[in-house]
Each structure stands twice: as C-alpha cells, then as structure tokens.
Amino acid sequence: MKSWVRQGRRLVLVGMLAWVLLFLALLSYFLDARVNEPLTSTGSVLYQHPDTRRLASIQASQLHNTNLGSRPELASTLTATYTRDEPRPSATPEFSLEASQSPDSAPLAIYGGPEGIHQDYLDPQSLAAWSSFGTENIGSQSDPVIQSRERTSQNHGSITRYRGGEEEEEEEEEEERQENEDEDVANGLRNTAARKPGGDSSELEKYYFSKSISVVQRLWRGHVSADMLSPRLQRAMKDYVSANKHQVSYRGRRRPSQSAKELLCEMKAQARLQMVDGTQQPFSSLGWASLVPSLPLEQLHKRPDQGSFKSCAVVTSAGAILRSGLGREIDAHDAVLRFNAAPTEGYERDVGNKTTIRIINSQILANPNHRFNTSSLYKDVVLVAWDPAPYTLDLHKWYASPDYNLFGPYMEHRRAHPDQPFYILHPRYVWRLWDVIQGNTQENIQPNPPSSGFIGILLMMTLCEQVHVYEYIPSMRQSDLCHYHERYYDAACTLGAYHPLLYEKSLIQRINTGPGSDLRRKGRVTLPGFSTVDCDI
C-alpha cells in the first residue's frame, strides 16, 4: 500500500514538472516571437509610412540581388537605405507623413515572393537624390569602418576649429593620415572578404562607405574620377551610358584642363537663359505666346548694366545644412533660390526663410502629393520648372511624352495666377549645360540632364553679381541624411548615379573663388556672376 502511494506521488511530481517545463517553453516561444517581430508589421506606426515600406523592401531584398541581371534602368545597382534617428532641425518641427511622401524617397522597391522578384523602378528624377556610394546596411557601432568614419568627422571638427595660420598644412597632413588609415581598413576588409565564399561584396562595400569622407576631401581639392565610386555605382554609370535614354551624341571638344577663367567664359557663352516662350512649335499653335510671362526672367529685377541682383544664395536641400546656423547669413542676400519641396518653416536657423526663386522638376507639378496648387511653398515666388527632353531637342516628342506631364498643370496655373512669374526652361538650355560638363571632363559622363542644383547655380550666375552656394559641395558636416527635411539616410545622396553630379561639383569647385575654410566649415562656394566676368567676346 505504501509502495503504491509513494509511486503515485512520484507520478504527480513528474506530471507537475512536465507542466512547468511546457509552460516555460510556451512562454519562451511567445516572448521570442514578440522580440523578433519585424518593424514592418502592420501594427507598426513606422511601417505605415510609405517611404519606410520601400526602404524595408529594399533591405529585405538584398539577399536576392545576386539573382538580378544587369538592366538598363539601373535600379538593381542601387543600394539599400536605412533609417536612424530623425533629423533634428533648429526648431525641431514635427515630421508629417506628407513631408516624407516625396517620390524622391527611394530609387526602387524590390519585392520578393513566391512568384519571384518584382521591381518597381522609380523615375530618373527620383534617382537624383539616391545616387552616390554603393552601400549595404551598416552594422553595429563597433564596426571598425564606422569607428574610423566617426574619428575622421571628429578630427576634422577639432582641427578646423583650433588651428591658426597653419590650417592648410595641417589639414593636408590629416587627410593623408586618414587616407592611410582607410587603406589599412580596406586591406583588412579585402582579406576578410577574400576568405568568405562569394568574395568581395558586403565587407568591401563597407570599405567604400567609409571612404566617403576622403572622397569629399578630394572633391574639395578638385580631384575626381569615377574610380572614387564603389564598384556598384561604377557599374550603374556604365549602364546609364549604355542605355542612353535621351539619345545623347556629344561631338564637341574635350578640354578638361581649362583655367578657371576659360571655364567661366565657356559657361557664360553656353548658359544664356532660354525659356519656353511660345514661339516654337508645337507651343505656338497652342497659344503659348500669350500664356507665358511677357517679361523674361533676367529682366524681372534688372538694373542698368548690372545683373538683376548683387548677392544671391543657392540653398541646396542637403542634410548637412542642419545645425549650420546659416539662416541669418542666407537671408542677408538680395535673392535666395531653393529647390523643389524644400521647406523653410521650422528650419529658419539653418536655412533662413527668404525665397525669391524656386526651381521645381516636373514631378512637383504632376504628383498630387506635392499639393502644387495649394501649398504655400509655391506662392509669392518666381517659379522655374524643367523636365528632361531628348538631346535632339525634338519639342513635339517632348510635348507628347514628357517624363512627367508638366504642361497641363503649367497652363492651368498660368491661367489661375497670371501675375505670378512662372517659366519652363527650354531643353536647349539644359543640354547646353550638359555639354559644358562633358566638354570639361575627360571621362564619359552620364548621358542624362544635369541636376537641379547645377541648373540653379548657373541660372543664378546669370542673374546675380555674386553667388554663394550652400552644401552643394559638402562641408565637414557631411551626413548620410539625404535631405534636411526628410527622414531617410543613405550615403548615396552626394555624388550621383543618374545625374553627373560628381563632375558637376568638380566644375563648380574649379571656379570657386572663396577660401577653403568656407567650404570646410560652411559648405559655401563663392562664384562670380557672369556680368562680372570679362571674356572679350
């Protein structure tokens, strides 16, 4: 009897122990499932943001990239982006979903599923902001590449702040030291990559990401080449050259060694403003002569024998302008040019609040998310729109098939607001600027229109006696934040894939008359207006 009771107690204890173990196992399972729940769940507020969905799709697709063949559209050569902490503008405004719904938010979306991989290719203008270095998702802060990059940024800040008359010499020594350090890191990464199956992809990409600081330093010195880009972006450039969407056929001379004065005079001759004025077909038959502004842009504020303005500021949308404190300096100019949907409200301390001219690409007019007809961004300013057109200047083809339909919204806006100066750049003007870039570059550049930034700079050099350009060539504040007003980060927003940004910036640096300290500390380039350049022509 006692033996039976003792055995029963043992069975009860074993059963209780089994239930406890089962409970712990179930608890552990559900806790792990909760911890591992991706940010892209439908319950995540972050994932409700359309840009975040695109970025998550790109990141998730990295494992499939080796299955993607070479495509003319290039999207497969562009890289994943990643989100971090939100940018902190001077007044720390609230970030609205609308502000980040720009079509410029990602180069493409790649979706993997049971039926294979599907890619949504974004338009060329969207690719403008997603262009420089090929990058993977960056790992932890213990990564030697990240630590090296952080040390570089800190060293530049302290060295520039405290050195005196020996500034240039010490900076060159620091740059050389950093380049040697980066090379050591690169050798280690190459060796690591070589030991792994598949070779040189992810670790070597981190190396190219770490080189972004030294690339900017070379840009400060005016030394640029496509070899500075990652292999991924070099392939992208080659594919764009092969695709040649706009049928570009350059037959001009190559003069990469022109002096600053010679380059300025060539720019002055080629960059004569030309707008769609309604005198050419098909616009003349559509009555555009009475639709466009009667006064040319260069005569809006014309003074006798001078440019329209004495001093002008071109404010790019780069994230590096955050925490610059340049707002008051920017607003002190006679005229200020801004781009696309870049706001000023909430960012006044860094970017100012004056806007005289706003250059907008055709997406702004065509995409209802930009609220072109209702947003205050596009009111009480001079508007200049542009859209890529064939290199052959076939206006009939352009009108019938623009990249984005800007013509209908333009006509509607002009009829509703006839007193607001609103122009469309003639394709001849845009492609002449491209000819200048290619003619002064030994390498073959992308056969795509220049960026809005380059167009805006040359436009203001026509209208102003002196032009200050902010953060077109990055300062020591260089950041992975693509735009100061949007919440996405990528190292691929500096030197271009679709637009020939690398070569554009090299040309601007060649004609920069400002001191090197302005470029490093403020990201400011000083350029003479064309009216002040004597070319004897």
UniProtKB/Swiss-Prot annotation:
It is an enzyme of class 2 (transferase). It catalyses: a beta-D-galactoside + CMP-N-acetyl-beta-neuraminate = an N-acetyl-alpha-neuraminyl-(2->6)-beta-D-galactosyl derivative + CMP + H(+). Glycans are attached at N353, N373. Its main location: Golgi. The chain crosses the membrane at residues 11-31. Disulfide bonds join C265-C535, C312-C464, C482-C493. Its EC number is 2.4.3.1. Residues 83-117, 134-202 are annotated as: Disordered. Residues 32-537 are lumenal. PANTHER family: BETA-GALACTOSIDE ALPHA-2,6-SIALYLTRANSFERASE, BETA-GALACTOSIDE ALPHA-2,6-SIALYLTRANSFERASE 2. Transfers sialic acid from the donor of substrate CMP-sialic acid to galactose containing acceptor substrates. This is Beta-galactoside alpha-2,6-sialyltransferase 2.
